[in-house]
Amino acid sequence: MEKSTVYFTDFRCSVGTSQLDKLKKLCVAAGIKNIDMDGKFVAIKMHFGELGNLAFLRPNYAKAVADLCKEQGGMPFLTDCNTLYPGSRKNALDHLDCANLNGFNPISTGCQIIIGDGLRGTDEVEVPVVNGEYCKTALIGHAVMDADVFISLTHLKGHESTGFGGAIKNIGMGCGSRAGKMQQHASGKPAVREKLCRGCGRCAKECGSDAITYVNKKAVIDYDKCKGCGRCIGACSFDAIYNPNYNANELLDRKMAEYAQAVCYDRPCFHISLVQDISPNCDCHGENDAPILPDIGMFASFDPVALDQACADACLKAAPIANSQLGEHLSQPGWHCHHDHFKDSNPNIEWQATLDQAEKIGLGTRQYELKRI
């Protein structure tokens, strides 16, 4: 497969310009105007942030992309699907309230918001996964599949289960209905290392399913309630909660790539990733830890695999921030350094499996040419 082109611009701005101007220029250079949007519905998939989290992308970025779509005659809307776990985005009403509270509304974004899988997270379409190995079909939010054109607008950050959350995760996990998310997460559930558990209560507080209680000051997981989302793993500061299924995260990664294939296959797609506020964990948390790496820039491509690879490569070349989870890990005596910022931040991950599987099934290629704008 030939190399894909990924376009890049940094966040530096001279007087009289803005990051929004640079984002629009990046998208135009990357070819967004080559997509026929005239009279067509354009889904812009992004994460509105959990309440309390401040690392998500500002709504101004969404407006810049929506404005470009409208200039081309498109009818854009922002979309995301409901979460598997309880929280502020578990149904469409709460999800819309959360989006509004975090600044996303028709005025700030220039378009409407539609929750992709409906009121209860059950408005889904069963979509074939071309070349799928782990998922023959995917359960995708109906509104996502109703769109004529699909654009992903991604905040790249670390992730406690997948290593980092890039375009493929935004598409694959984000566009899955609640049942679709369950299918992806069903590879394994966490367990507790009692010797390491301090009984601090952070995991129980983070669990949206009320699946964690304490016996003799040690965490105990009720597997009848546990959804397998892995939020407790990221919440624990003592490595006391882990996934005993050694390949559970890898299976999650590969399923996620196949779900992204279902969303993108055989229709016009365009992908944008902003590498800033690189927190160690997902924006699904109700908080965000300090960034592990400095802000890097904005990337765009027609190929989500090449895009994720380019973003990952840029992150791996960056110097860690000392006062961060990554910096603290690397400063610990005896810490086993993986020379991989994502793995050194969250050791029990296999992020490259996502890109391997995505390339294998034809979603894109990991080989790319980077063009700076």
Listing of model-derived features with the role each one plays in the protein:
Residues 2-61, 71-80, 85-373:
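Extended, low-polarity segments enriched in aliphatic/aromatic residues
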